């Protein structure tokens, strides 16, 4: 999921 700098999709 979101790490702050790079938004990752929550899968």
UniProtKB/Swiss-Prot annotation:
Give the GO terms filed under biological process for this record.
neuropeptide signaling pathway
- Give the UniProt subcellular location, in the record's own words: Secreted
Q: Where does the record place the modification Valine amide?
A: 11
Q: Name one GO cellular component term.
A: extracellular region
Write down the superkingdom of origin.
Eukaryota
Tell me the keywords, alphabetical order: Amidation, Neuropeptide, Secreted
UniProt entry tagged with the keyword Translocase: no
> One Pfam family name from the record?
Periviscerokin
Q: What is stated as this protein's family in its record? A: Belongs to the periviscerokinin family.
Please give the function described in this protein's UniProt entry.
Mediates visceral muscle contractile activity (myotropic activity).
* Name of the protein described by the UniProt record: CAPA-Periviscerokinin-1
Origin species: Namaquaphasma ookiepense (Gladiator bug)
């Amino acid at each position: 999921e979101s790490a702050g700098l790079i938004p990752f999709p929550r899968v």
